[in-house]
């Protein structure tokens, strides 16, 4: 894979683990490891699994009209969200067609985190910035490693790594440390957490896990 293919910040860790890579949404992504897909699947279902989802995009939306912007962009009453509450929603076009599904989390009175999919990240940012021009807001794309720790033992695994998760409810998200975003969410059907954090912190966390 050459040309404009994007690479994960932690690609070297995947290479060292024996990953086989394939193309997905313009990214070179680890698809399989020597243990095999079935063992990985069962381990995540029965214990916990670590997934690198850094191809997904985080946007921080802040300012006096942050909620109003998200109300305009999504079928969502952003102002009704409680602090730390997350909501699955969509970006809609002018014909009310779905552009992308995403999760919006309220971080504070005037700030929100938006997690969008890799395949639509560029279009999502363009759409959000176009709408934002009519509002008193700042749209900030974040350069973060994004990790998902999923499975019934995810909370215990993170606890052993020094990350407290017990007070974080499902479909809620917080900023537990400087430049970190952590939510209790995922797409595996099990309990789990998603953490966006700087590369240096991510490498330290992966080493502990």
Predicted segments — roles?
Residues 1-209:
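Basic, glycine/lysine-rich polyanion-binding surfaces/domains
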């Amino acid at each position: 894979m050459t040309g404009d293919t994007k690479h994960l910040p932690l690609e070297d860790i995947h290479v060292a683990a024996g990953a086989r890579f394939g193309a997905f949404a313009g990214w070179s992504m680890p698809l399989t490891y020597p243990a095999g897909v079935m063992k990985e699947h069962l381990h995540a279902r029965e214990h916990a699994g670590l997934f690198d989802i850094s191809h997904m995009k985080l946007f921080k939306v802040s300012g006096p009209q942050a909620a109003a912007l998200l109300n305009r962009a999504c079928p969502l009453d952003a102002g009704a969200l409680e602090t730390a509450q997350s909501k699955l929603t969509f970006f809609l076009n002018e014909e009310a067609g779905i552009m992308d599904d995403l999760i919006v989390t309220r971080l504070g009175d005037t700030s929100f985190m938006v997690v969008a999919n890799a395949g639509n990240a560029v279009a999502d940012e363009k759409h959000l910035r176009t709408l934002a021009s009519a509002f008193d807001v700042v749209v900030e794309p974040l350069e973060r490693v994004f990790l998902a720790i999923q499975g019934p033992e995810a909370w215990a695994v993170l606890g052993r790594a020094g990350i407290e998760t017990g007070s974080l409810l499902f479909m809620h998200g917080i900023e537990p440390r400087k430049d970190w975003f952590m939510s209790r969410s995922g797409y595996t059907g099990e309990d789990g957490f998603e953490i966006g954090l700087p590369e240096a912190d991510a490498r330290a966390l992966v080493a502990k896990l």
